[in-house]
Amino acid sequence: MQVKDQLSSLQPYKPGKSPEQMKEVYGDHSFVKLASNENPFGCSPRVLDELQKSWLDHALYPDGGATTLRQTIANKLHVKMEQVLCGSGLDEVIQMISRAVLKAGDNIVTAGATFPQYRHHAIIEGCEVKEVALNNGVYDLDEISSVVDNDTKIVWICNPNNPTGTYVNDRKLTQFIEGISENTLIVIDEAYYEYVTAKDFPETLPLLEKHKNILVLRTFSKAYGLASFRVGYAVGHEELIEKLNVVRLPFNVSSLAQKAATIAFGDDEFIEEIVRVNTEGLRQYESFCKENEIPFYQSQTNFIFLPVENGGEIYEACAHAGFIIRPFPNGVRITVGTREQNEGVISVLQQHFENKKRKSRDEANA
């Protein structure tokens, strides 16, 4: 049996290892998962309370158009319901966009170190992928603009960026958008939008009034703590959303997920508290890194990236101490946890870097 030739160069997405998988390698003790940027505090208590009180007929299909959820999102964001598209997580939304827009001979442009699903789905559709290196961990929009051509159908911008946690500011993004043809779709993935505290972070939704070629993505998997429910959404021009709905699978968001997301979206106090605690957690890591002269990227997300050469060693040290983090070829990404969890990881990092310094001194004196 034959499949698309382009699939031969791809591998299935590999998520962070689960505690169960870690036990098979590192022994049967408890693990704290800090690899997938999930909310360590879970979701709003309102969600749990309301779901326990409500009754859903599990024999019936969900609302295929996610009408109540889309209207709730639209009301809060001050857009029309027809401008909102819901998917089973942003992974499905990215797949829908790629399937609807791309064809063989087209190309996409994005960063070299960013969310891998942009590249993954472009290759499946037979497209060229133009990847531009980050500039000190940040999207280089000037360089991206220089490689966009007439065959560029999508520019993907992850803002804040995963895995570095960095962001493109309002001035740079607006300037970039002004220089891109209306024939090229600019997708701005704001999965970590709720965590942002930077004053010059761009507010992208008002840009939709002027630019029909902008699509903004957000999710309930991160700050809202609903990763297991799989709900993400896109906001864009009505005509584009209508076309994307053509490739959307019927009944793609479950009834339970729609209800949970609708409830969660109304609990602003919960999100405010999550952002406050997350900001404190980031300061824990930043203070430690500054005191010990360990490189890190200033993060606007719920994780921190350390661009170090020995990421594999750090991963192993954390794993043996019961912490699951995410290794990369050029560093490690650590999800911000509870204060106690952060202290635990920092203790491991402290010991690791002290051991490396001691080893370097011993080698120099040998």
From Swiss-Prot:
The modification N6-(pyridoxal phosphate)lysine is found at K222. It catalyses: L-histidinol phosphate + 2-oxoglutarate = 3-(imidazol-4-yl)-2-oxopropyl phosphate + L-glutamate. Keywords: Amino-acid biosynthesis, Aminotransferase, Histidine biosynthesis, Pyridoxal phosphate, Transferase. It is an enzyme of class 2 (transferase). Disulfide bonds: none annotated. CDD domains: AAT_like (cd00609). Pathway: Amino-acid biosynthesis; L-histidine biosynthesis; L-histidine from 5-phospho-alpha-D-ribose 1-diphosphate: step 7/9. Residues 1-21 are annotated as: Disordered. Its cofactor is pyridoxal 5'-phosphate. Its EC number is 2.6.1.9. GO terms for molecular function: histidinol-phosphate transaminase activity; pyridoxal phosphate binding. Homodimer. Belongs to the class-II pyridoxal-phosphate-dependent aminotransferase family. Histidinol-phosphate aminotransferase subfamily. This is Histidinol-phosphate aminotransferase 2. It comes from Bacillus anthracis.
